[in-house]
Amino acid sequence: MANFTDAASLQQFDELLKNNSKSLTVVHFHAPWAPQCSQMNDVMAELAKEHKHTMFVKLEAEAVPEVSEKYEITSVPTFLFFKGGEKIDRLDGAHAPELTNKVQRLGSGGGGAVGAGDVPKEDLNQRLKRLINAAPCMLFMKGSPQEPRCGFSRQIIQILKDHNVQYSSFDILSDEEVRQGLKTYSNWPTYPQVYVSGELIGGLDIVKELVESGELENTFPKTVSLENRLKSLINKSPVMLFMKGNKEAAKCGFSRQILEIMNNTGVEYDTFDILEDEEVRQGLKTYSNWPTFPQLYVKGDLIGGLDIVKELLEGGELVSVLKGEN
């Protein structure tokens, strides 16, 4: 597709912004080792088919550091939105509904006249169907989970939180077409509206009834708390190394050094690539009160980072520590 391309250098990036200054340009800062980036590239490809007047660009964050540093890209996937060569918005993380909404909203206001070769605006029913299927559980509400903008939305957010329900949300106040269209599409006149697997569950009253009857647990997808997830990960193997990259390909010098040391001990260990999961990356810093990576754990207990491992190696204690003898 002419409007879905790659930028492999600073020069290419600048040229793409210059050549598409009259329309919206969406840049996906990605990494080939991150599965969520691959998923979002698929979303971008679909959006490119529907929004021919918008330019969609993939840029490998680590391959073009000049651009990544300029725009303070610290994790992938990250999306930047440009018009007239200037950044106008940003989206961090793999959030397909939010990306779709931003492309629709930011792209609709400009880009010059629509030419004869451009595709007509996406059919509303198709768009609504795609939105309600964007996640296993979708909540259409006023505002966001962080800032609900009506009492009913605030109540339903609290219920979902209390029952550890995993969901994505869409702010109907940001899109009047979706707000009005969904009422007719689902024959449900009020908000919030909750969907599971593309099927309407109902609004606040229905969700409250599910709570009272004890059926809510079996209706909604559950989420695991971050703390429980971290506990599970650090105990996944007797020796766990949280690093940038994996055994086959370390993605920073510190991780590469600790891999060499670990491989020379002959002790079996497992690894977790923190670059693939920002929630784990940030959560582990707080959970273990250790701000840097790599981090080494034995039987669920933090041993430390590269410096500690080097000290244990020099003191002749590393192998016994890894075997849980100390």
Swiss-Prot record:
Pfam families: Glutaredoxin (PF00462), Thioredoxin (PF00085). GO terms for biological process: hemoglobin metabolic process; intracellular iron ion homeostasis; multicellular organismal-level iron ion homeostasis. It is found in: Cytoplasm, Cytosol. Keywords: Cytoplasm, Iron, Iron-sulfur, Metal-binding, Repeat. The keyword Metal-binding applies. GO terms for cellular component: cytosol; nucleus. Residues 1-108 form the Thioredoxin domain. [2Fe-2S] cluster binds at residues 150, 252. Residues 125-227, 227-326 form the Glutaredoxin domain. The keyword Repeat applies. GO terms for molecular function: iron-sulfur cluster binding; metal ion binding. CDD domains: GRX_PICOT_like (cd03028), TRX_PICOT (cd02984). Disruption phenotype: Morpholino knockdown in embryos reducing the levels of grx3 protein to 40% severely impairs the synthesis of heme and the maturation of hemoglobin, and results in individuals with fewer red blood cells. It comes from the Eukaryota. InterPro entries: Glutaredoxin, GRX_PICOT-like, Monothiol_GRX-rel, Thioredoxin-like_sf, Thioredoxin_domain. Together with bola2, acts as a cytosolic iron-sulfur (Fe-S) cluster assembly factor that facilitates [2Fe-2S] cluster insertion into a subset of cytosolic proteins. Required for hemoglobin maturation. Does not possess any thyoredoxin activity since it lacks the conserved motif that is essential for catalytic activity. The thioredoxin domain lacks the two redox-active cysteines. This strongly suggests that it lacks thioredoxin activity. PANTHER family: GLUTAREDOXIN FAMILY MEMBER, GLUTAREDOXIN-3. Homodimer; the homodimer is independent of 2Fe-2S clusters. Heterotrimer; forms a heterotrimeric complex composed by two bola2 molecules and one glrx3 molecule; linked by [2Fe-2S] clusters. This is Glutaredoxin 3. It comes from Danio rerio.
